[in-house]
Amino acid sequence: MRPYDIAKPFLFSLPAETANKSVHRLLETVDGTRVADVMADRYTVADERLAVEAFGHTFDNPVGVAAGFDKNATIPETLASLGFGFAEVGGVTAEPQAGNARPRMFRLKADEAIINRMGLNNDGAIVIGERLKNVDAPFPVGVNIAKTEHVGTNEAPDDYRTTYEHVAEGGDFFVVNVSCPNSEGFEELQNRDAMEAILSELQDAGAAPLLVKLSPDLPEPAVEDALDLVTELDLDGVVATNTTTERPASLRSPNAVETGGLSGKPIENQATEMVRFVAERVDVPVVGVGGVSTAEGAYRKIRAGASLVQLYTGLVYRGPSIAREINSGLRDLLAEDGFDSVEDAVGADL
């Protein structure tokens, strides 16, 4: 039995957000200690076959932590000790935000899923930017940039630029979040003109590498418009996808009635197909997100065109050994299929 199997019943007896904060505090306390070194020895899978080159950075392995887990950039180094290949912090907004009223995070235990309507609560770009300057993580750290809640569509480009300028020094890559389902005003940002204005403003500010994060709920023509922009503006990558407001009929948990973005196992196949759709249409690295919790699931996304994968909900349900388990499994799957590296397997099913 893994230690997390012992701790999980207690954590799951707490409200989801309370448990999340408790885990964060624990991870913060081990940062820079001998415990972090022991964790790194235990959880890191060192194998050159897992390494990936993407948007100008080397990732020791393709498994990262998605935005939303480390909102305020307080634990990147500790996440590296858990064996992850990178982390994306945020979403970060120009001003501090309290987010939506609680409760705002719900476990769907029977479905291995989460619904959240957090509302982009974060410490704000000034505080997080200063914090990022002091981060000394041994892996690439991305910054998810989002719109401040009270800012309208016309003012959004300047708002995103302000956030970027505060976090620029501490980020290794930047993800433009125009697809958050839990904050007002994001739907309008996903039309072509609004998205182009935001992305162009960030490029004018020097934001690079620059990626855009898309919603799984966009109709196909809107996704194609967004991907046309990726090519026209010469962006560096695409993150596919965000959480979904849709509710599959297969959901069994009582909390399925809650509003917010759904993440976890129920959206795994939908997210993988979105990765495939994107990878078939653009010639930039794709970061696959949605329902990743096993080596097999990560491998399906990689074969569908993802150069990297991210997870959040899987960490909640599977615990701190998840990166090691996925990376160990990926190593075996690559060998079984005769691939010399993860990079060789990217897009194998296209």
Curated annotation (Swiss-Prot):
One of its GO terms (cellular component) is plasma membrane. Gene3D superfamilies: Aldolase class I. This is Dihydroorotate dehydrogenase (quinone). GO terms for biological process: 'de novo' pyrimidine nucleobase biosynthetic process; 'de novo' UMP biosynthetic process. It comes from Haloarcula marismortui (strain ATCC 43049 / DSM 3752 / JCM 8966 / VKM B-1809) (Halobacterium marismortui). It is a peripheral membrane protein. Its EC number is 1.3.5.2. FMN binds at A67, G68, F69, D70, K71, G91, N144, N177, K213, T241, G264, G291, Y312, T313. The active site is at C180. Pfam families: DHO_dh (PF01180). InterPro entries: Aldolase_TIM, DHO_dehydrogenase, Dihydroorotate_DH_1_2, Dihydroorotate_DH_2, Dihydroorotate_DH_cat, Dihydroorotate_DH_CS. Residues 245-265 are annotated as: Disordered. Monomer. Its cofactor is FMN. It is found in: Cell membrane. It is an enzyme of class 1 (oxidoreductase). Keywords: Cell membrane, Flavoprotein, FMN, Membrane, Oxidoreductase, Pyrimidine biosynthesis.
